[in-house]
Design a protein with these regions (language model features):
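Residue-level signal for inorganic ion chemistry
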Residues: 26, 49, 75, 103, ...
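N-terminal glycine/serine-rich phosphate-binding loop of ATP-dependent small-molecule kinases
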Residues: 1-96, 122, 148, 225-233, ...
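Active-site core segments that coordinate phosphate-bearing ligands/cofactors
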Residues: 2, 8-10, 107, 114-171, ...
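A generic structural motif
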Residues: 35-37, 101, 285
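Short linear loop/turn motifs
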Residues: 206-215, 321-328
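Short beta-strand-loop/turn "lid" adjacent to the catalytic site in phosphate-handling enzymes
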Residues: 62-101, 127-131, 138, 162-185, ...
Protein backbone atom coordinates (compact mmCIF):
# COMPACT_ATOMS: atom_id res chain seq x y z
CA UNK A 1 0.00 0.00 0.00
CA UNK A 2 1.14 3.55 -0.62
CA UNK A 3 2.20 5.76 2.26
CA UNK A 4 -0.98 7.39 3.54
CA UNK A 5 -2.04 8.24 7.07
CA UNK A 6 -3.97 5.54 8.90
CA UNK A 7 -6.30 5.56 11.90
CA UNK A 8 -7.08 2.28 13.67
CA UNK A 9 -10.34 1.78 15.54
CA UNK A 10 -10.75 -0.87 18.23
CA UNK A 11 -14.39 -1.85 18.70
CA UNK A 12 -14.55 -3.78 21.97
CA UNK A 13 -18.06 -5.19 21.88
CA UNK A 14 -19.95 -7.50 24.20
CA UNK A 15 -19.26 -10.65 22.19
CA UNK A 16 -16.03 -9.88 20.36
CA UNK A 17 -13.29 -7.47 19.37
CA UNK A 18 -12.85 -5.87 15.95
CA UNK A 19 -9.83 -3.80 14.97
CA UNK A 20 -10.05 -1.85 11.72
CA UNK A 21 -7.56 0.36 9.88
CA UNK A 22 -9.04 3.25 7.89
CA UNK A 23 -6.90 5.03 5.30
CA UNK A 24 -6.95 8.79 4.67
CA UNK A 25 -6.86 8.30 0.89
CA UNK A 26 -9.99 6.15 0.90
CA UNK A 27 -8.24 2.84 0.28
CA UNK A 28 -10.22 -0.24 1.38
CA UNK A 29 -10.09 -0.71 5.13
CA UNK A 30 -8.37 -3.66 6.78
CA UNK A 31 -9.98 -5.44 9.72
CA UNK A 32 -9.73 -8.46 12.01
CA UNK A 33 -12.33 -9.89 14.38
CA UNK A 34 -12.19 -12.32 17.29
CA UNK A 35 -15.00 -13.54 19.54
CA UNK A 36 -14.53 -14.18 23.24
CA UNK A 37 -16.34 -16.41 25.70
CA UNK A 38 -19.55 -15.50 27.52
CA UNK A 39 -19.80 -16.99 31.02
CA UNK A 40 -23.13 -17.55 32.80
CA UNK A 41 -22.13 -18.92 36.24
CA UNK A 42 -25.61 -18.43 37.75
CA UNK A 43 -29.04 -17.37 36.47
CA UNK A 44 -28.89 -13.64 35.73
CA UNK A 45 -25.10 -13.51 35.94
CA UNK A 46 -22.93 -12.67 32.91
CA UNK A 47 -19.14 -12.51 33.04
CA UNK A 48 -16.15 -12.05 30.75
CA UNK A 49 -12.55 -13.12 31.17
CA UNK A 50 -10.66 -9.81 31.07
CA UNK A 51 -7.46 -11.52 29.95
CA UNK A 52 -9.32 -13.10 27.03
CA UNK A 53 -10.61 -9.65 26.05
CA UNK A 54 -7.09 -8.23 26.10
CA UNK A 55 -5.76 -11.18 24.11
CA UNK A 56 -8.46 -10.57 21.48
CA UNK A 57 -7.54 -6.88 21.34
CA UNK A 58 -3.85 -7.69 20.99
CA UNK A 59 -4.46 -10.36 18.37
CA UNK A 60 -6.77 -8.31 16.14
CA UNK A 61 -4.74 -5.12 16.50
CA UNK A 62 -1.43 -6.79 15.68
CA UNK A 63 -3.05 -8.60 12.73
CA UNK A 64 -4.25 -5.30 11.29
CA UNK A 65 -0.96 -3.49 11.94
CA UNK A 66 0.89 -6.26 10.09
CA UNK A 67 -1.14 -5.41 6.96
CA UNK A 68 -0.50 -1.67 7.15
CA UNK A 69 2.60 -0.17 5.56
CA UNK A 70 1.73 3.43 6.31
CA UNK A 71 2.18 5.68 9.35
CA UNK A 72 -0.45 5.04 12.03
CA UNK A 73 -1.67 8.45 13.13
CA UNK A 74 -3.81 7.31 16.05
CA UNK A 75 -5.81 4.57 17.71
CA UNK A 76 -9.40 5.13 18.82
CA UNK A 77 -11.33 2.88 21.19
CA UNK A 78 -15.04 2.29 21.51
CA UNK A 79 -16.33 -0.25 23.97
CA UNK A 80 -19.21 -2.04 25.63
CA UNK A 81 -20.28 0.24 28.47
CA UNK A 82 -20.96 -0.44 32.18
CA UNK A 83 -19.04 -3.74 32.19
CA UNK A 84 -16.53 -3.46 35.01
CA UNK A 85 -13.53 -5.27 36.42
CA UNK A 86 -10.94 -4.95 39.17
CA UNK A 87 -7.22 -5.47 38.73
CA UNK A 88 -3.91 -4.99 40.49
CA UNK A 89 -1.93 -1.99 39.24
CA UNK A 90 1.32 -3.59 40.32
CA UNK A 91 0.91 -6.96 38.60
CA UNK A 92 -1.67 -6.03 35.97
CA UNK A 93 -3.65 -9.16 36.86
CA UNK A 94 -7.45 -9.04 37.10
CA UNK A 95 -9.20 -9.96 40.33
CA UNK A 96 -11.54 -12.51 38.78
CA UNK A 97 -13.84 -12.01 35.83
CA UNK A 98 -15.41 -8.79 34.59
CA UNK A 99 -19.10 -8.31 35.45
CA UNK A 100 -20.95 -7.56 32.21
CA UNK A 101 -23.52 -4.81 31.72
CA UNK A 102 -26.28 -7.42 31.25
CA UNK A 103 -25.60 -8.95 34.69
CA UNK A 104 -28.45 -8.67 37.23
CA UNK A 105 -26.82 -9.96 40.41
CA UNK A 106 -27.11 -6.61 42.20
CA UNK A 107 -30.86 -6.18 41.62
CA UNK A 108 -31.70 -6.70 45.30
CA UNK A 109 -29.04 -4.23 46.37
CA UNK A 110 -30.40 -1.61 44.01
CA UNK A 111 -33.83 -2.22 45.52
CA UNK A 112 -32.43 -1.63 49.00
CA UNK A 113 -31.12 1.75 47.83
CA UNK A 114 -34.45 2.91 46.39
CA UNK A 115 -34.59 5.90 48.73
CA UNK A 116 -31.38 7.18 47.12
CA UNK A 117 -32.93 7.35 43.63
CA UNK A 118 -33.41 11.15 43.70
CA UNK A 119 -29.70 11.62 44.45
CA UNK A 120 -28.62 9.16 41.76
CA UNK A 121 -31.01 10.66 39.20
CA UNK A 122 -29.95 14.24 39.92
CA UNK A 123 -26.21 13.56 39.84
CA UNK A 124 -25.96 10.98 37.05
CA UNK A 125 -29.10 11.14 34.91
CA UNK A 126 -29.45 7.39 35.45
CA UNK A 127 -31.75 5.16 37.48
CA UNK A 128 -30.84 2.73 40.24
CA UNK A 129 -30.35 -0.42 38.22
CA UNK A 130 -27.82 -3.29 38.21
CA UNK A 131 -27.17 -2.43 34.56
CA UNK A 132 -24.81 0.34 35.65
CA UNK A 133 -21.33 -0.07 37.08
CA UNK A 134 -21.60 1.31 40.62
CA UNK A 135 -23.38 -1.61 42.24
CA UNK A 136 -21.16 -4.05 40.31
CA UNK A 137 -18.06 -2.39 41.78
CA UNK A 138 -19.60 -2.62 45.24
CA UNK A 139 -20.28 -6.33 44.69
CA UNK A 140 -16.69 -6.97 43.58
CA UNK A 141 -15.37 -5.25 46.70
CA UNK A 142 -17.71 -7.13 49.05
CA UNK A 143 -17.93 -10.56 47.44
CA UNK A 144 -15.25 -10.82 44.76
CA UNK A 145 -12.18 -11.27 46.95
CA UNK A 146 -10.89 -7.92 45.73
CA UNK A 147 -8.34 -6.43 48.15
CA UNK A 148 -8.90 -2.73 48.80
CA UNK A 149 -5.28 -1.63 48.58
CA UNK A 150 -3.40 1.27 47.03
CA UNK A 151 -2.78 -0.95 43.98
CA UNK A 152 -6.50 -1.51 43.29
CA UNK A 153 -7.87 -0.42 39.92
CA UNK A 154 -11.59 -0.39 39.16
CA UNK A 155 -12.52 0.39 35.60
CA UNK A 156 -14.63 -0.18 32.54
CA UNK A 157 -13.37 -2.02 29.46
CA UNK A 158 -11.86 1.08 27.84
CA UNK A 159 -9.70 1.61 30.94
CA UNK A 160 -8.57 -2.03 30.90
CA UNK A 161 -7.61 -1.91 27.21
CA UNK A 162 -5.72 1.38 27.52
CA UNK A 163 -3.96 0.15 30.66
CA UNK A 164 -2.68 -2.84 28.70
CA UNK A 165 -1.86 -0.94 25.50
CA UNK A 166 0.28 1.47 27.54
CA UNK A 167 1.56 -1.27 29.87
CA UNK A 168 0.22 0.58 32.90
CA UNK A 169 1.33 4.08 31.95
CA UNK A 170 -2.24 5.37 31.51
CA UNK A 171 -5.18 4.63 33.81
CA UNK A 172 -7.96 6.68 32.20
CA UNK A 173 -11.52 6.66 30.96
CA UNK A 174 -13.56 9.25 29.09
CA UNK A 175 -16.67 11.09 30.24
CA UNK A 176 -19.04 9.04 28.06
CA UNK A 177 -17.95 5.85 29.83
CA UNK A 178 -17.70 7.46 33.27
CA UNK A 179 -21.27 8.71 32.92
CA UNK A 180 -22.50 5.08 32.85
CA UNK A 181 -21.07 4.10 36.23
CA UNK A 182 -23.63 5.71 38.61
CA UNK A 183 -20.61 7.35 40.25
CA UNK A 184 -20.03 10.33 37.92
CA UNK A 185 -21.63 13.77 38.33
CA UNK A 186 -22.55 14.65 34.74
CA UNK A 187 -23.04 18.34 35.53
CA UNK A 188 -19.85 18.88 37.53
CA UNK A 189 -18.07 16.40 35.19
CA UNK A 190 -16.19 14.62 37.97
CA UNK A 191 -16.49 11.58 40.22
CA UNK A 192 -19.09 12.19 42.93
CA UNK A 193 -17.80 11.71 46.50
CA UNK A 194 -21.41 11.17 47.68
CA UNK A 195 -22.09 8.38 45.20
CA UNK A 196 -18.71 6.73 45.69
CA UNK A 197 -19.43 6.71 49.42
CA UNK A 198 -22.93 5.31 48.82
CA UNK A 199 -21.50 2.31 46.95
CA UNK A 200 -18.36 2.00 49.06
CA UNK A 201 -16.07 2.62 46.09
CA UNK A 202 -12.70 4.24 46.92
CA UNK A 203 -12.16 7.17 44.58
CA UNK A 204 -8.42 6.49 44.43
CA UNK A 205 -9.22 3.22 42.62
CA UNK A 206 -11.06 4.98 39.79
CA UNK A 207 -9.43 6.12 36.54
CA UNK A 208 -8.72 9.71 35.59
CA UNK A 209 -11.50 11.08 33.38
CA UNK A 210 -10.17 12.57 30.14
CA UNK A 211 -11.76 14.09 27.04
CA UNK A 212 -13.29 11.74 24.48
CA UNK A 213 -11.01 13.31 21.87
CA UNK A 214 -7.36 13.98 22.69
CA UNK A 215 -4.23 12.09 23.56
CA UNK A 216 -4.99 9.67 26.40
CA UNK A 217 -1.69 7.79 26.18
CA UNK A 218 0.64 6.07 23.73
CA UNK A 219 1.20 2.41 23.02
CA UNK A 220 4.08 0.55 24.60
CA UNK A 221 5.96 -1.92 22.42
CA UNK A 222 4.70 -5.50 22.45
CA UNK A 223 4.63 -8.34 19.93
CA UNK A 224 3.22 -6.89 16.72
CA UNK A 225 2.39 -3.49 18.24
CA UNK A 226 5.00 -0.72 17.97
CA UNK A 227 5.62 1.86 20.66
CA UNK A 228 4.47 5.44 20.41
CA UNK A 229 1.10 5.22 18.64
CA UNK A 230 -1.17 7.89 20.18
CA UNK A 231 -4.44 6.71 21.72
CA UNK A 232 -6.52 9.70 20.70
CA UNK A 233 -10.17 8.78 21.02
CA UNK A 234 -12.34 7.00 23.61
CA UNK A 235 -16.12 6.61 23.66
CA UNK A 236 -18.75 4.21 24.88
CA UNK A 237 -20.17 2.26 21.96
CA UNK A 238 -23.56 3.95 21.79
CA UNK A 239 -22.12 7.45 22.10
CA UNK A 240 -19.58 6.55 19.41
CA UNK A 241 -22.46 5.42 17.19
CA UNK A 242 -24.25 8.74 17.77
CA UNK A 243 -21.10 10.60 16.72
CA UNK A 244 -20.41 8.21 13.84
CA UNK A 245 -23.91 8.78 12.46
CA UNK A 246 -23.10 12.52 12.41
CA UNK A 247 -25.77 13.39 14.98
CA UNK A 248 -24.07 16.68 15.78
CA UNK A 249 -27.19 18.86 15.83
CA UNK A 250 -29.55 19.10 18.78
CA UNK A 251 -32.49 16.80 18.14
CA UNK A 252 -30.68 14.42 15.80
CA UNK A 253 -30.83 10.78 16.84
CA UNK A 254 -29.82 7.22 15.96
CA UNK A 255 -30.96 3.68 16.74
CA UNK A 256 -28.48 0.80 16.93
CA UNK A 257 -29.37 -2.88 16.79
CA UNK A 258 -26.63 -5.07 18.23
CA UNK A 259 -26.30 -7.06 21.43
CA UNK A 260 -29.07 -4.77 22.65
CA UNK A 261 -31.00 -1.95 20.97
CA UNK A 262 -30.30 1.66 21.87
CA UNK A 263 -31.88 4.94 20.78
CA UNK A 264 -29.86 8.08 21.54
CA UNK A 265 -30.73 11.71 20.79
CA UNK A 266 -28.34 14.65 20.93
CA UNK A 267 -29.86 17.20 23.33
CA UNK A 268 -27.12 19.82 23.16
CA UNK A 269 -24.69 21.27 25.67
CA UNK A 270 -27.11 21.92 28.56
CA UNK A 271 -27.73 18.93 30.80
CA UNK A 272 -31.51 18.33 30.73
CA UNK A 273 -33.68 17.53 33.70
CA UNK A 274 -34.37 13.79 34.14
CA UNK A 275 -37.16 12.54 31.87
CA UNK A 276 -39.44 9.68 32.92
CA UNK A 277 -38.51 6.49 31.11
CA UNK A 278 -35.33 7.94 29.62
CA UNK A 279 -31.71 8.17 30.70
CA UNK A 280 -29.61 11.30 30.52
CA UNK A 281 -26.01 10.62 29.62
CA UNK A 282 -22.85 12.32 28.41
CA UNK A 283 -22.65 12.00 24.63
CA UNK A 284 -19.08 13.28 24.34
CA UNK A 285 -16.55 15.74 25.63
CA UNK A 286 -14.26 16.92 22.84
CA UNK A 287 -12.01 18.90 25.17
CA UNK A 288 -13.47 22.25 24.11
CA UNK A 289 -14.88 23.14 27.53
CA UNK A 290 -18.42 22.15 26.52
CA UNK A 291 -20.04 18.77 27.11
CA UNK A 292 -22.64 17.37 24.72
CA UNK A 293 -25.46 15.40 26.35
CA UNK A 294 -27.88 12.76 25.09
CA UNK A 295 -31.17 11.16 26.04
CA UNK A 296 -31.18 7.37 25.78
CA UNK A 297 -33.72 4.58 25.62
CA UNK A 298 -32.42 1.02 25.87
CA UNK A 299 -33.56 -2.57 25.28
CA UNK A 300 -30.90 -4.78 26.84
CA UNK A 301 -31.41 -8.03 24.91
CA UNK A 302 -31.84 -8.30 21.14
CA UNK A 303 -28.88 -9.73 19.23
CA UNK A 304 -27.46 -11.41 22.33
CA UNK A 305 -30.54 -13.65 22.37
CA UNK A 306 -29.22 -15.29 19.19
CA UNK A 307 -25.89 -16.01 20.83
CA UNK A 308 -27.75 -17.48 23.83
CA UNK A 309 -29.74 -19.76 21.50
CA UNK A 310 -26.44 -20.95 20.04
CA UNK A 311 -24.21 -21.15 23.12
CA UNK A 312 -26.68 -21.28 26.01
CA UNK A 313 -29.33 -23.80 25.00
CA UNK A 314 -27.67 -25.12 21.82
CA UNK A 315 -30.69 -25.15 19.51
CA UNK A 316 -28.69 -23.68 16.61
CA UNK A 317 -25.10 -24.13 15.47
CA UNK A 318 -24.76 -20.85 13.57
CA UNK A 319 -26.46 -17.46 13.88
CA UNK A 320 -27.57 -17.71 10.23
CA UNK A 321 -29.91 -20.57 11.18
CA UNK A 322 -32.18 -18.37 13.27
CA UNK A 323 -34.03 -16.88 10.27
CA UNK A 324 -35.23 -20.18 8.77
CA UNK A 325 -36.03 -21.46 12.28
CA UNK A 326 -38.21 -18.42 13.02
CA UNK A 327 -39.99 -18.81 9.68
CA UNK A 328 -40.77 -22.47 10.35
CA UNK A 329 -43.70 -21.61 12.67
CA UNK A 330 -46.69 -19.31 12.07
CA UNK A 331 -46.30 -17.34 15.32
CA UNK A 332 -44.63 -17.30 18.73
CA UNK A 333 -47.51 -19.03 20.49
CA UNK A 334 -48.21 -16.03 22.66
CA UNK A 335 -44.67 -15.75 24.05
Amino acid sequence: MSQTAVVIAIDAGTTGIRSRAVFADGSPSVSAYQEFTQYFPKPGWVEHDANEIWQAVHSTLSTVIAQVNSPIAAIGITNQRETVLAWDKLTGKPHGNAIVWQDRRTADRCGELASELPLVRAKTGLVLDPYFSGSKMEWLLKHGNVPDTAQLALGTIDSWIIWNLTQGAAFVTDASNASRTMLFDITAMKWSPELCSLFGVPMRALPTVVASSGRAGVTAASAGIPAGIPISGIAGDQQAALFGQACFETGSSKNTYGTGSFVLMNVGTTCPQPTEGMLTTVAWDLGTGETTYALEGAIFVTGSAIQWLRDGINIIDHASQIGPLAESVPNSGGV
